[in-house]
Amino acid sequence: MTSEQVDAFVQALHVAASNSTKPLVRSTLYTISATPEDAFEHSILSWKAQEYAYRQFSRDSAELPTLARGLFTEVVCENGKEHARIVARGYDKFFNMGELPWTSREAIGRYSQGPYTLSYKENGCIIFVAALSPVRLVITSKHAIGARPDAPVSHSDMGRTWLLRHLEQQNLNEVDLAAELWHRNETAVLELCDDSFEEHVLPYSAERTGLHLHGLNANTIDFKTRPMDEVNAFAEHWGFIPVRYKVFDTIEDVDAFAKKVAKTGSVDGEPVEGFVVRTTMPFTLDVEEGIVPPPYKPGQTWFYKIKFDEPYLMYRNWRELTRTMLRAKRI
C-alpha cells in the first residue's frame, strides 16, 4: 500500500461525504493537542457510515468506499509533502449468517475455507488503541475521541483508564505500547467490559472486567487482521484479557458446534451472545451464478457472526421493556 493509494482512498471518502444532501458517510474532526513528548498537534478525522449503507456496499461504490466500521485518518508531512495516513482502523462491518445474500449458508460454504476461528462475542463496547507517534497513543471509541458533553465519562476516556491499569500490571507504559503499535502499523481492537461503567445484557465477573483484546488490524485500506493465536499472545504480554476462541477445520464442523450451543445458548453452562467466525476467501475464486460472493479478494480474511436468540435475546427484550416502563412512569 503506497502513500498515493491512501491519499486516493481518503479523497474518495471526502468526495462521498460531499456527494449529496444525505451522504452515506460523514466525518467528524477531533483535535489532539501537542505534548512535551509529541510536539505536533494532530487533526484526526473520524469517518462514520450510515448503518444501512453497509448493506448496499460494493467494491466499486463511490458512495461508500469502505466497509470499515471505525476509521480515523490524519494528514501528515513526509519528506516535505503532505499525505493522508490511516491512524486507526476497525473491522469491516460483518453480518449474521443469512442476513445478506453473501452471508447465506450457501455463499459461506462456497466462498470460505478453513480453518474457521470462532471467537466468543463479548458483550461490551469497542475501544481502539493506535499510535499517534512512536511515543504517543490515541484511544478511541468506535467513532469518537475524548470527552462527551452528554456523559460524565466517555467510552474512550474509560478505555484509557483501563488501558493504563492493564499496562501498569505488566510494568509497561503508554510509550512502550505506542512504539510497538507504530512499528507494526496496527490498531488494537478491544472490548470494554465493565458493568460499573456501562451495564450490558450479560454480566462480567471481576476477573473478566476490563479490556478484552480480540483483534490486531493493519492500518490499511483493505481489511487485514492477525490470527487469534497472535492476538492472544499480544494480550498476554501487554496485560489485556485474552478472548476465548475455538478452531474448526470445516464449515460442517462449525454448523454442528453452533447447533449444539443454540440448544441452550451457553457453553459449559455460561450464556453466550454468539460467535464471530473468522475465515478467508478461497485463493482461487470460482463464482457460481446465483450465489453472491462476499466483496473480498482471493485469500482475504472476512468475518460473519452467529448470534443466539436465547437466552441473550430474552434478556435484552426484558431489559428494553423495563426501560420503557420506567420512562413511562417518569412521564
Task: Specify the residue positions occupied by each region the protein language model found.
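Core nucleotide-handling region used for phosphoryl-transfer chemistry
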Residues: 1-331
